[in-house]
Regions:
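Generic detection of long, well-ordered alpha-helical segments
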Residues: 32, 59-67, 176-186
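Charged, glycine-rich intrinsically disordered N-terminal tails and low-complexity linkers that flank
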Residues: 1-64, 205
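Intrinsically disordered, low-complexity boundary segments flanking structured domains
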Residues: 1, 28-29, 68-72, 153-159
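Generic structural marker for isolated residues within well-ordered, non-membrane alpha-helices
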Residues: 39, 70, 140
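Short, flexible loop/turn segments with low-complexity composition
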Residues: 195-205
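Nucleic-acid nuclease catalytic cores
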Residues: 77-99, 103-196
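Acidic-basic catalytic patches of nuclease active cores, encompassing PD-(D/E)XK
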Residues: 59-81
Length: 205
């Protein structure tokens, strides 16, 4: 992995994301029709335009609360959880992730942390569900695809408005179902990128 220590949501960070499959967008690969995502990435690659998604009130809440949630996570787990700006895959520079945190041991990342700060209703649903919510599965699994050394990813939901404010669910790389899923993802990622390159070549003919 290649770590770029840039501030998330800065101009430099947005520029690094251009034409790159990141954690927040990786789910588009698995849609029944992923062609719009193909064109989105090609447009970014060819134009260099930074298209910032509208920031909703819920997103602003999450951005503001994330540092508080990470501090709570550190206190609860005693983990050496470090904020990282942007991480690029060693072999494929079109794959990257902006982790909420990586957990280090002896100077090596051994785990990832994906934080959500949802509404109380959603937080309670996540606690009762006892697993990674379906809408965040691709994002969580993307950590394993980018950072080879991590052995687990903690999905964290944080809501300081209730007594059970922190929910942590750990996904292990060596879980047989996870290992099988990761093999499938490798094929799908490469298949998608081959498709994108074919579309781009046709456009540039």
């Amino acid at each position: 992995m290649k770590i770029k220590n840039v501030e998330q949501r800065s101009k430099e960070w947005f520029e690094m994301r251009l034409g790159v499959i990141t954690g927040s967008r990786v789910g588009n690969i698995f849609k029944s029709n992923n062609v719009p995502f193909v064109y989105e990435l090609i447009a970014e690659r060819l134009s260099g335009d930074i298209i910032e998604s509208p920031t909703t009130q819920a997103m602003m809440h999450g951005i503001m609360m994330e540092p508080v949630a990470l501090d709570e996570y550190r206190m609860r787990t005693n983990a050496d959880a470090r904020e990282v700006g942007f991480v690029i895959h060693d072999d494929h520079d079109w794959l990257a992730i902006s982790p909420d945190a990586l957990v280090y041991e002896n100077g090596v990342p051994i785990g990832g942390v994906e934080i959500k700060c949802p509404s109380t209703k959603k937080h309670l649903e996540y606690i009762n569900g006892g697993k990674v919510p379906a809408q965040y599965k691709h994002q969580v699994m993307h950590y394993f695809m980018i950072v080879d050394s991590i052995q687990w990813v903690d999905f964290v939901s944080f809501d300081p408005r209730i007594s059970k404010k922190l929910f942590i669910f750990r996904v292990h790389r060596d879980d047989p179902d996870v290992a099988l899923d990761l093999e499938m993802r490798k094929m799908e990622y490469l298949k998608f990128w081959d498709k994108l390159n074919k579309y781009e070549r046709k456009i540039l003919e």
